[in-house]
Amino acid sequence: MTILALGINHKTASVSLREKVAFVEDKRQRAFEQIRDQSLAESVVILSTCNRTELYFHQPKIPPQEEHPDNIAWREQCFNWFAEIHQLDKEELSEAYYFKQNLEAARHLMSVACGLDSLILGEPQILGQVKQAYQESEEFYHSQGSGVSTNLSRLFQKTFATAKRVRSETEIGSSAVSVAYAACGLARQIFDDFTKLRFLLVGAGETIELVARHLINHGAKNIMIANRTHIRAEMLAVKLDIPMQILSLSALQIGLNQADVVICSTGSPDILITKEMVEQAQKQRRFDPMLLIDIAVPRDIDEKAGELDSIYAYSVDDLQNIIQQNIAQRQQAAEQAKEIVIEEAKDFFVWLKQQQSTNLIKHYRQNAEEIRLDLLEKALSALQQGQDCEKVLNELSYKLTNQLLHIPTQALQAMAKNSNVKGLQSFSKALKLEE
């Protein structure tokens, strides 16, 4: 059995590559279907955010040893599929992608969910994104009449519990540090007084909600929201309890013409704000400074807009400097969190081994019971035919002993051949032998 984590993130790939491998709209559904049809995994969870795209495969038929030929072939098959679904050159992808298996994969997932692998150390939004990814996987497999495999499901439930423990036992989440906070911090570096600015927020998801809260906390009073669905933007305005002008995406130009600061975070696969739209807005605004912050992957704002005069344009990658300033205070807490992750990942694999041994014992007992019933049936038949009782019982006990010991004997021979000293010692101890 093998659990494989495969993907890229902000540490290994640029925004341009990350946006190419984002699972947007129907691509996620196609991925689930292709993985099922190609038997790549019994279950998979697809995590796709601004800063990472990762897939967590569970394949019980693949041996866990990374050097095993079947394991190597399977990894290559998964990589080839990943490149193909995104129509990427394998050489380009191979420079940025990574894979982790079993214990290492469990540690990685837990680290991701705890915010230890995030662009902003300890940011809390990623946990919600991991939960959403798991929920989408559950929905797909339930639609197929099954569910996420027991082992992969258990790993994610353990991950959620670990993240909760990290939040409660460390100070990693004590300060409001996130992508949204970094975007707000960038705006404060360029503009002094938020009370006099007009903000245009594009999108109405969790990240934009956090951006809006940070802006309001720093004095913003004039906020516009543009979103694909009017009702969702309206709900956000009610939630934030502040009057906001709500625009449709088709009316983005109206908002741009008025905005000093534009912050975008949607799931759109296409550019929403072009260079020409910004140029037109600047003419309306008499070329007053405008800040464009695009925290969406794929991009919402044409990167060429940053070439215009009086425009300050930043992408997710450009937030790195602000983020670095906030990392130092979380390093100590992160070290504590890493210890918790190591402990919990180890605990998960203890459970996994117990589960595997329980299943093994169950199957062995079932096999033994089948042997017993088969030999008993033959013995009873022999007795009914008038054969000597003692002879029948001797034959029954002899065959029963031989057949029941056949599998353990093979296992012992395999352990000796593979130099499995611990296994042999455990068996010897169970039999109360000296050596």
Curated annotation (Swiss-Prot):
Binding site for substrate: T49, C50, N51, R52, S118, E123, P124, Q125, Q129
Catalytic reaction annotation: (S)-4-amino-5-oxopentanoate + tRNA(Glu) + NADP(+) = L-glutamyl-tRNA(Glu) + NADPH + H(+)
Marked site (Important for activity) residue numbers: H108
Keyword Transmembrane helix: no
SUPFAM superfamilies associated with the record: Glutamyl tRNA-reductase catalytic, N-terminal domain (SSF69742), Glutamyl tRNA-reductase dimerization domain (SSF69075), NAD(P)-binding Rossmann-fold domains (SSF51735)
Pfam families, per the entry: GlutR_dimer, GlutR_N, Shikimate_DH
Organism superkingdom: Bacteria
Active site: C50 (nucleophile)
InterPro entries reported in the protein's UniProt record: 4pyrrol_synth_GluRdtase, 4pyrrol_synth_GluRdtase_dimer, 4pyrrol_synth_GluRdtase_N, GluRdtase_CS, GluRdtase_dimer_dom_sf, GluRdtase_N_sf, NAD(P)-bd_dom_sf, Shikm_DH/Glu-tRNA_Rdtase
Family of the protein in this entry: Belongs to the glutamyl-tRNA reductase family.
Subunit structure: Homodimer.
Further remarks about this protein from its record: During catalysis, the active site Cys acts as a nucleophile attacking the alpha-carbonyl group of tRNA-bound glutamate with the formation of a thioester intermediate between enzyme and glutamate, and the concomitant release of tRNA(Glu). The thioester intermediate is finally reduced by direct hydride transfer from NADPH, to form the product GSA.
Protein name: Glutamyl-tRNA reductase
Originating organism: Glaesserella parasuis serovar 5 (strain SH0165)
Phylogenetic placement of the source organism: Bacteria, Pseudomonadati, Pseudomonadota, Gammaproteobacteria, Pasteurellales
